Amino acid sequence: MDPRSEVILRQQDYLKGRVLLINAPNDALVSQLPTEIDASVWTWNYADYQVFLNAGATAHFSVEFPLQEFDQAIIFVPKSKELLNYILHVVMSHLKIDQSVFLVGEKKGGVERAAKQLQSFGKILKLDSARHCQLWHLKIEKTEKIKPLESWLKTYTVQVNEQELTICALPGVFSQTHLDVGTAVLLPYLNQVKSGRIADFGCGAGIISCYLAKANSSNIIHALDIDAFALQSTEMTFSRNGIGSDQLRLQPVTGIADAPTELDAIVSNPPFHQGIHTNYDASEGLCQNAKKHLKASGELWIVANRFLNYPILIEKHFGQCEIKTDLQGFKVLYACA
């Protein structure tokens, strides 16, 4: 069990009524809480959401606070400070004065910094500190009026092959405020991608998806991501750039196995972070299984850190892998099914 969940179980006497667990790990915590606790989970991680559903838990997959009332909330500290600001805002705009909010996190995950953010809403008390985790309690003294989701957007422009795109990114989304180096290295090659039905695996704020849709109005883009905030950001990016929703298919996925089949191309700057931890499962799975989702002669385009062994993995499953460029620590890899 996650050590943060163990802290919650140790201090379960503080819990009562309808309790919302926000960003909780997908372990056995919910099933081990006392039966008198009416626990629900709010997550934006689609893989976690599936685990909660399969375990019979009441779970919500969304960027927005669930549409019901709660007596308490437990926030598992996210990696992003901006995302925590958003979560605190929506919690304080749904809960009432004198209700309880708990904050739990790992020291290396920034729980002490997060506790300072919590102080804006009342006096806080540290309830537990063990196994490199801390649990803080707040009795709400100040609530907030909900702001529209759009007010949390960060926008920036990107120039790609004579096209200027406006990128919209919500809190917690990869490269929320600027173009990342890996995607920048890949972008000049996107005009070579085969047209048709194209999947953007790990779409993030929708930079790749948006360019491919604008480059050819007959392209259908399947924007795939595990994160609800990424999918929402991609939808907002399309809207901001005047691209019709008929070109966009948004799909939450747990990995490449959930992707559509018979695709003309898969393009990806694959994700490798899960919370504060590095995880290459999704990107390695992409290299190994992408071919199953492509038509004959369909294309795989990936940008990845040069130290990763993706060319070998791709060659093993496609029979070949071409390195299009090796620049600023990143390689653009190409394979044809």
Curated annotation (Swiss-Prot):
Key words, A-Z: Cytoplasm, Methyltransferase, rRNA processing, S-adenosyl-L-methionine, Transferase
GO cellular component, one term: cytoplasm
Compartments where located: Cytoplasm
Catalytic activity: guanosine(1207) in 16S rRNA + S-adenosyl-L-methionine = N(2)-methylguanosine(1207) in 16S rRNA + S-adenosyl-L-homocysteine + H(+)
SUPFAM superfamilies in the cross-refs: S-adenosyl-L-methionine-dependent methyltransferases
GO molecular function: 16S rRNA (guanine(1207)-N(2))-methyltransferase activity; nucleic acid binding
Quaternary structure (record): Monomer.
Family: Belongs to the methyltransferase superfamily. RsmC family.
Record-given protein name: Ribosomal RNA small subunit methyltransferase C
Species of origin: Acinetobacter baumannii (strain SDF)
